[in-house]
Amino acid sequence: MVLFLIRIFSDSDKEENMGIEKTVSELADILGVSRQAVNNRVKSLPEEDLDKNEKGVTVVKRSGLVKLEEIYKKTIFDDEPISEETKQRELLEILVDEKNTEITRLYEQLKAKDAQLASKDEQMRVKDVQIAEKDKQLDQQQQLTAKAMADKETLKLELEEAKAEANQARLQVEEVQAEVGPKKGFLTRLFAK
């Protein structure tokens, strides 16, 4: 839609601006500077501000004349009346250009933000994978710790059982020794008779 408006204005301006174009010589006379100085300035203007007349001579369009007025701080087409419709059209063109520039800037910002979001999404995906791996490692560690604790308890119970059995065996040995009497050495038994 914006491009359509620009095209309409461009076509209608061509018809209306025919009388508002100036050659380098005319501009030099109006501005009171040399033809060479004006020619150098005109060469620095964008292509859209220039045209060729029916004789093939380079002429500066109204948009270029406005720019030259700003550079030289002099009025170039003061004596030529500008219709209210032309003023409105020019104002609308300026607004459309500004809006197009703003839209382009915002679009570029949006593309940059989209790229940032895509990068952040990738970082989040990598972090999710890392977190899942850490969770898996933590779960394995907890399982190993639980197994080690269970093994420790089992060994503790087995040790207590072994101690109890050893105590019981020692008590039985002591009982048998008490019944049998004190042990006599080999020589004592041999000579005691």
From Swiss-Prot:
Domain of life: Bacteria
Coiled coil: 86-181
Keywords on record: Coiled coil
The protein's name in its UniProt record: Uncharacterized protein Spy1595
Organism: Streptococcus pyogenes serotype M6 (strain ATCC BAA-946 / MGAS10394)
